[in-house]
Amino acid sequence: MAGVLGMILAGGEGSRLRPLTESRSKPSVPFGGSYRLIDFALNNFVNADLMRIYVLTQFKSQSLFHHLKKGWNINGITDRFIDPIPAQMRTGKRWYEGTADAIYQNLRFMELEEPDQVCIFGSDHIYKMDIKQMLNFHTEKKASLTVSALRMPLKEASQFGVIEVDAEGRMIGFEEKPANPKSIPGEPDFALVSMGNYVFEAQVLFSELVEDADNEASSHDFGKDIIPKMFPRGDVFVYDFSTNRISGEKEEVYWRDVGTIDAYWQAHMDLLEKDAPFSLYNRKWPLHTYYPPLPPATFTDSDNGRVQIIDSLVCNGSYVRGSRIEKSVLGFRSNIASACDISECILLGDVKIGEGCVLRRVIVDKDADIAPGTQIGVNLQEDKKHFHVSEEGIVVIPKGARVGY
């Protein structure tokens, strides 16, 4: 689809994911052992054969740049590119003021590509979407803007833009993060919310961005300013994400916002269910990323006991000796000494766990080194004196930490 340009918003600071975002942007946070959060948005474009993509970066972007260079370098192929673009600061020495401002400051790059449609997507959610199906819906409706949406429990909807639609899928109401969200007619416990993914007719987008940039009263945000201004015209439509079908996937779609530590941990636990709602193994929808050249994971018994790996994901380069690993995700080069008991944990890679450690519901960031005999997640009151502990009791060991020495 040569006339389509992708713009991925990847500048999120991710303050609610701290300490995982202390040294990296939210889109570059590791996920599922092998991936980064941004990989899922990129795969949605690439698997739909949409290969002209700008990735707009901002905060702490070095890790993200490195990942894109190593794993997503398709430049050199005619008319195909995935290019990261740092904050342009074209309107002064400041960061992007909102999602619309981020796109506006890169207007020149878009105009040079001469697209017919522009797809603007976020980069910090876990889901699979065939974007071509959304584009087809957009074209059939002759829309100037199409917003993708999904049903959300009403109690959670205030964190999103809440949408009202008519029988034809036309947007007839929109409120950004309302305190009292409106429910779907006939479904009092659910609301229809924006996923933050947009398909614009290019010339409409360019015009709206210029007009919005000149408005000093605007917050320069799609949800707060652009969409409320556009939908009363009657040519803004809503694409129902639940109708998106991918070969080899379950009929019930999966979408997770992993903006908090608890949500991030739960999304990993979803991967480990017997009948996982989100699969990493669909050959018809491969999940591309950067895979470092590492040997296979190794599991060996020790004098302290046999190795047990139960309902877990273990990445290449990992070495587990005589320990028990249950419902956990071990990233690249996780080194687990003997007699450890690790349950419901996420190790982000290059982690050393000493002999006899006990870990329960712990996220261990990269390059951490935990001394032999250390217990984490067993006594939360004690853990709170040393580490970040989430509302639901998930302990986070920060990047590069030395614990118990």
UniProtKB/Swiss-Prot annotation:
EC number: 2.7.7.27
A biological process from GO: glycogen biosynthetic process
Coiled-coil segments: none
Bilayer-spanning residue ranges: none
InterPro entries: ADP-Glc_PPase (IPR011831), ADP_Glu_pyroP_CS (IPR005836), GlgC_bac (IPR023049), GlmU/GlgC-like_hexapep (IPR056818), NTP_transferase_dom (IPR005835), Nucleotide-diphossugar_trans (IPR029044), Trimer_LpxA-like_sf (IPR011004)
Reaction(s) catalysed by this chain's protein: alpha-D-glucose 1-phosphate + ATP + H(+) = ADP-alpha-D-glucose + diphosphate
Entry-linked Pfam families: Hexapep_GlmU (PF24894), NTP_transferase (PF00483)
Entry-linked CDD domains: ADP_Glucose_PP, LbH_G1P_AT_C
Annotated binding of alpha-D-glucose 1-phosphate, by residue: 96, 161, 176-177, 194
Pathway(s) it belongs to: Glycan biosynthesis; glycogen biosynthesis
Gene3D superfamilies attached to this UniProt entry: Hexapeptide repeat proteins, Spore Coat Polysaccharide Biosynthesis Protein SpsA, Chain A
Keywords tagged on the record: ATP-binding, Carbohydrate metabolism, Glycogen biosynthesis, Glycogen metabolism, Nucleotide-binding, Nucleotidyltransferase, Transferase
Molecular function terms from GO: ATP binding; glucose-1-phosphate adenylyltransferase activity
PROSITE patterns, alphabetized: ADP_GLC_PYROPHOSPH_1 (PS00808), ADP_GLC_PYROPHOSPH_2 (PS00809), ADP_GLC_PYROPHOSPH_3 (PS00810)
Quaternary data: Homotetramer.
UniProt similarity note: Belongs to the bacterial/plant glucose-1-phosphate adenylyltransferase family.
Function as written in the Swiss-Prot or TrEMBL entry: Involved in the biosynthesis of ADP-glucose, a building block required for the elongation reactions to produce glycogen. Catalyzes the reaction between ATP and alpha-D-glucose 1-phosphate (G1P) to produce pyrophosphate and ADP-Glc.
Designated name of the protein: Glucose-1-phosphate adenylyltransferase 1
Organism: Vibrio parahaemolyticus serotype O3:K6 (strain RIMD 2210633)
Classification of source organism: Bacteria, Pseudomonadati, Pseudomonadota, Gammaproteobacteria, Vibrionales
Gene, per the UniProt record: glgC1
